[in-house]
């Protein structure tokens, strides 16, 4: 285990290395607030967040800075810099947070472009790419500094269903290959059922249920059942149409 949230003395949810951990729930349930808290944008009013057996609020400022260097973020939009090429976008965090040579940075960026299947577009600019290709570049940039944790905020927002599945599988593959603890905020049922290794359901700011994609459709948690039945895909699986 690399990370967990504690509510008073109980472990509310644990996030596992090499797994796609998902935070799901209706709009207003607290997914985005919790994700931002886990990233370290602000601290919790109560409860605890533990990284590698260390409680976040008890870390020194220097320790927090070092921890933040282990974190990669994939934003809801592409969040790419229009004035930088694809290669330049991936090199951006390396420019500011490493002492690597220009050759080393380019080598690492090209390696990552190959991993996300965008190796033939390194000299293009973001506005020359499709939404799916921009998202691939965003993934490459998010893991440019070899993070231990990857936070994804609605990574499939704005993508068509077919592209969403491709991005889901890419995130899952990267997570497992690099041994990253990935934490994803999503309401996309396809994503949940495709790659949800560990799922936490939030309801009114509380994690009510934790399980995986294999157990979620047989849940007896009433608020979770109501959430699932509000989704056409899940509803048709739970209650097949005649």
Predicted regions: what they are:
Residues 47-55:
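Conserved ABC transporter NBD signature motif
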Residues 39:
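Helix-to-loop junction immediately C-terminal to a conserved catalytic motif
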Residues 144-148:
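A short, proline-enriched helix->beta-strand linker immediately N-terminal to the Walker B motif
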Residues 150-153:
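Catalytic Walker B motif of ABC-type/P-loop ATPase nucleotide-binding domains
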Residues 55, 102-120:
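Conserved ABC ATPase "signature" region
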Residues 125-129, 133:
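Conserved ABC ATPase signature
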Residues 1-5:
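Short, small-residue-biased leader/transition segments that mark boundaries at the very start
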